[in-house]
Structures are given as C-alpha cells and as structure tokens.
C-alpha cells in the first residue's frame, strides 16, 4: 500500500502528530487495509480526516492528534457525518492508538 504521501523517515524531524500518523499507517499496512491521505487544498475538501481507510468493506475515517488536542469544529462535523452514515470515525493520539488495531480486528 503506497498512499502517495511519505512521512519523514527520521523520527527526530517528525511532529508529534506525524509520529501518530506513522504508527497508524504501520497498523493499517499490517492489516492490508486500503488507505490514503486526502487532499485538503485546491479541489480537496477541508475538515476531512487525516487518513481515509477501507477495510473488510468498512469505511473508516481517522483523525490523528497529539497529546490532548481535539478535532476542530469542521473536523468534528466530518467525523460525525461519517459515523451517522454507517462509517467508523476515530480520533487517535499516542494514548489510544490501539483503538485502530481494535477496529481492524473486529
């Protein structure tokens, strides 16, 4: 799975959020999930989750945060819409990254 967006390989140069994304991507690859990073500028859409996933026929939107940071109001609207239409919406940080594993194991 090459999602078209490469994160820096040197962890010292990575932001805390980028480190969370890297861990999420590793879990997604372990599960052979289809995923990509949506484009948010230009023709893209603002507020969409950081990573869009399809796994075993399920649509999953993953918003990655660091520490106690929460989704912006627009990000939360998008996450709510995903959940309301039958998808799975996750907000993950360093503390709950195992939630991704749990969802993929279901």
Where are the language model's segments positioned?
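Catalytic phosphate/metal-binding cores of nucleic-acid and nucleotide-processing enzymes, i.e., regions
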Residues: 1-106
């Amino acid at each position: 799975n090459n999602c078209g967006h490469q994160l820096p390989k040197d962890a010292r140069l990575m932001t805390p959020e980028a480190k969370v994304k890297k861990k999420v991507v590793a879990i997604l690859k372990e599960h052979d999930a289809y995923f990509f990073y949506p484009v948010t500028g230009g023709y893209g859409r603002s507020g969409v989750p950081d990573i869009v996933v399809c796994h075993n026929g399920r649509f999953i939107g993953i918003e990655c945060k660091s520490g106690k940071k929460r989704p912006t109001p627009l990000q939360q609207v998008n996450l709510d819409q995903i959940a309301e239409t039958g998808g799975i919406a996750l907000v993950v940080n360093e503390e709950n990254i195992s939630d991704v594993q749990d969802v993929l194991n279901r």
